[in-house]
C-alpha cells in the first residue's frame, strides 16, 4: 500500500446535502418542504408534542406521584470498592471522599452489599444494608453507624 492509495473508510465521509440549489440537483425548488403550509414557511413547524389540535398524549395521561421534600440522597458505595483500602483501615465518609471512591458526601454514605469484601476493616457510615453489614462482619471487621 502506498500513500496515494489510502482511502477513507466506507461511510466515514458523507457529503452535506445542499437543498434549494437548482432543480437539477434533485433537491431544488421547494427544497424538500412540499408546497405551502406551516412547514414550508421560514421558522415554520409545530412544537414537540403537538398533535394537530387533538388532545396530546402527555395531557391524556394522568398525573402521578410527587416529589418528597424530605428525601435524603445518600452517596452509594458497594463493599467490593472497600477492597482498595489496606487491612485494618478505619473507613470514614471523609476518607472515601479523599480517595475518590465517592465524589460528593450528599446526605451521607450508604454501604451496599454488592461484591465480596476480603479485608478486615472498620467501616463508619450513615447507613448499611443488611447484606453489607453481614459482609463487613464476615470479613472480621466492624460496621458502625454514625
Curated annotation (Swiss-Prot):
Keyword terms of this UniProt record: Ribonucleoprotein, Ribosomal protein, RNA-binding, rRNA-binding
Molecular function terms from GO: rRNA binding; structural constituent of ribosome
GO-annotated cellular components: cytosolic large ribosomal subunit
Transmembrane parts of this sequence: none
Signal peptide span: none
Segments of skewed composition (Basic and acidic residues): 1-13
Pfam families, alphabetized: Ribosomal_L27A
InterPro entries for this protein: Ribosomal_uL15, Ribosomal_uL15/eL18, Ribosomal_uL15/eL18_sf, Ribosomal_uL15_bac-type, Ribosomal_uL15_CS
Top-level taxon in the UniProt lineage: Bacteria
Gene Ontology process terms (BP): translation
Region named Disordered: 1-54
Coiled-coil regions listed in the entry: none
Biased composition (Gly residues): 21-31, 42-52
Assembly: Part of the 50S ribosomal subunit.
Recorded family membership: Belongs to the universal ribosomal protein uL15 family.
Protein task: Binds to the 23S rRNA.
PANTHER family hit by this protein: 50S RIBOSOMAL PROTEIN L15, LARGE RIBOSOMAL SUBUNIT PROTEIN UL15M
UniProt protein name: Large ribosomal subunit protein uL15
UniProt source species: Bacillus velezensis (strain DSM 23117 / BGSC 10A6 / LMG 26770 / FZB42) (Bacillus amyloliquefaciens subsp. plantarum)
Amino acid at each position: 500500500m502506498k500513500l496515494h492509495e489510502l482511502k477513507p473508510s466506507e461511510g466515514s465521509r458523507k457529503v452535506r446535502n445542499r437543498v434549494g440549489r437548482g432543480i437539477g440537483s434533485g433537491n431544488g425548488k421547494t427544497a424538500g418542504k412540499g408546497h405551502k403550509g406551516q412547514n414550508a414557511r421560514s421558522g415554520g413547524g409545530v412544537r414537540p408534542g403537538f398533535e394537530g389540535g387533538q388532545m396530546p398524549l402527555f395531557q391524556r395521561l394522568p398525573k402521578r406521584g410527587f416529589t418528597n421534600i424530605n428525601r435524603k440522597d445518600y452517596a452509594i458505595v458497594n463493599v467490593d470498592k472497600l477492597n482498595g483500602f489496606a487491612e485494618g483501615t478505619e473507613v470514614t465518609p471523609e476518607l472515601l471522599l479523599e480517595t475518590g471512591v465517592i465524589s460528593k458526601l450528599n446526605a451521607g454514605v450508604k454501604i451496599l452489599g454488592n461484591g465480596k469484601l476480603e479485608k478486615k476493616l472498620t467501616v463508619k457510615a450513615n447507613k448499611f444494608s443488611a447484606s453489607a453489614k453481614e459482609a463487613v462482619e464476615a470479613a472480621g471487621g466492624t460496621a458502625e453507624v454514625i
